[in-house]
């Protein structure tokens, strides 16, 4: 029986990448040692890091105007790093909130800098949506504008990119990076924890415009200092080498399978399959307006919530793993990142249909 992992993160990895990692685990490149045992400053590992960055630059069309950093701390580490690096005296950092993670970013930034929070959601009788970007009412002056294009808990995705005449645009793309094509030049800093579309947890990708590195910001730990990490080649201290290795393998897999354009087409097909089933069911429901629905994270509710435990238990028995919703919102959630095949979503839909028939 095939098993499909719908966990929000750490998430499913491409089976081909997992198999290659297994084959190379104790003997990488014929060197007789694991990549986990290699010096991060060895010529072999340095070659891997260069290959990894070049692959990501090709996948996302990242120009030389940006540095690409591989940092510790995941997304939450960047919640601290962004204000520490980009703070400006007598200016407020604007945080556009559309769910749990964007609110968490605001809360962390409040420890270091002045913030202005803007709720960019609509709530119409319990149905949530994202306001048009033109209606966000961003202030005329700000140290930076921060937003999260995809909220994994709430299942809300923002497809348009905000702009500002003077303030840099910062995006937490932890759950949407590499899932759809974007124009990197519309942003000044993009960060992403790896554990959804890139690899295992333990590393964060930061794509930062070089001109931003000149900002003094606030006193900060070296491992959160963008300018220092750029100068040191992301090796101010020992990096998470195995996570970096697996990120390189995932990037190679993406390039071999049509790149971001192909991933986007597949992700649209997967999301449409699942949402269409939910919308045409009187047993399940979703609380997000169609134009604001996440392609990566699909929360849904059983109309009879007394069946929740039974649904989770039987879905696990059917090889459909980690479907229980986030504790904050309840219900169910299917996270369908790049590595999730269409067959996995079809298996979920088939199970949901059978469960509804059995329990109606």
From Swiss-Prot:
Its main location: cytoplasm. Pathway: Amino-acid biosynthesis; L-serine biosynthesis; L-serine from 3-phospho-D-glycerate: step 2/3; Cofactor biosynthesis; pyridoxine 5'-phosphate biosynthesis; pyridoxine 5'-phosphate from D-erythrose 4-phosphate: step 3/5. GO terms for cellular component: cytoplasm. Its EC number is 2.6.1.52. GO terms for molecular function: O-phospho-L-serine:2-oxoglutarate aminotransferase activity; pyridoxal phosphate binding. The keyword Amino-acid biosynthesis applies. Pyridoxal 5'-phosphate binds at residues 75-76, 101, 152, 172, 195, 237-238. PROSITE patterns: AA_TRANSFER_CLASS_5. L-glutamate binds at residue 41. GO terms for biological process: L-serine biosynthetic process; pyridoxine biosynthetic process. It is found in: Cytoplasm. Binds 1 pyridoxal phosphate per subunit. Gene3D superfamilies: Aspartate Aminotransferase, domain 1 (3.90.1150.10), Type I PLP-dependent aspartate aminotransferase-like (Major domain) (3.40.640.10). Catalyzes the reversible conversion of 3-phosphohydroxypyruvate to phosphoserine and of 3-hydroxy-2-oxo-4-phosphonooxybutanoate to phosphohydroxythreonine. Belongs to the class-V pyridoxal-phosphate-dependent aminotransferase family. SerC subfamily. This is Phosphoserine aminotransferase. The gene is serC.
């Amino acid at each position: 029986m095939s098993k499909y992992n719908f966990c929000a993160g750490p998430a499913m990895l491409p089976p081909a990448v997992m198999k290659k990692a297994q084959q190379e685990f104790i003997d990488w490149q014929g060197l007789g040692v694991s990549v986990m045992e290699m010096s991060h400053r060895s010529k072999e590992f340095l070659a891997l890091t260069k290959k990894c960055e070049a692959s990501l630059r090709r996948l996302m069309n990242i120009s030389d105007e940006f540095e690409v950093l591989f940092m510790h701390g995941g997304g939450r580490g960047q919640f601290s790093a962004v204000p520490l690096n980009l703070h400006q005296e007598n200016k407020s950092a604007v945080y556009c909130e559309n769910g749990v993670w964007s609110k968490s970013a605001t809360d962390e930034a409040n420890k270091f800098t002045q913030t202005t929070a803007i709720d960019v959601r609509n709530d119409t009788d319990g149905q949530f949506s994202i306001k048009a970007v033109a209606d966000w009412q961003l202030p005329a002056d700000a140290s930076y504008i921060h937003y999260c294009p995809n909220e994994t808990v709430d299942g809300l995705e923002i497809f348009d990119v905000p702009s500002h005449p003077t303030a840099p645009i910062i995006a937490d793309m932890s759950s949407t990076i590499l899932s759809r094509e974007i124009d990197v030049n519309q942003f000044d800093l993009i960060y992403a924890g790896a554990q959804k579309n890139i690899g295992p947890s333990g590393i964060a990708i930061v794509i930062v415009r070089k001109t931003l590195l000149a900002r003094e910001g606030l006193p900060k730990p070296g491992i959160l200092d963008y300018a220092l990490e750029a100068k040191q080649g992301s090796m101010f201290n020992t990096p998470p080498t195995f996570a970096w290795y697996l990120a390189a393998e995932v990037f190679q897999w993406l390039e071999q399978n049509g790149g971001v354009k192909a991933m986007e087409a597949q992700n649209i097909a997967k999301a449409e399959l699942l949402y269409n089933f939910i919308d045409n069911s009187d047993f399940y429901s979703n609380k997000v307006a169609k134009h604001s629905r996440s392609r990566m994270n699909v929360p849904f509710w059983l109309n009879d919530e007394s069946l929740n435990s039974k649904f989770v238990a039987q879905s696990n028995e059917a090889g459909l793993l980690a479907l229980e919703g986030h504790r904050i919102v309840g219900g169910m959630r299917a996270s369908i990142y790049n590595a999730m095949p269409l067959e996995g979503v079809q298996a979920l839909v088939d199970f949901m249909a059978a469960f509804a028939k059995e329990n109606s």
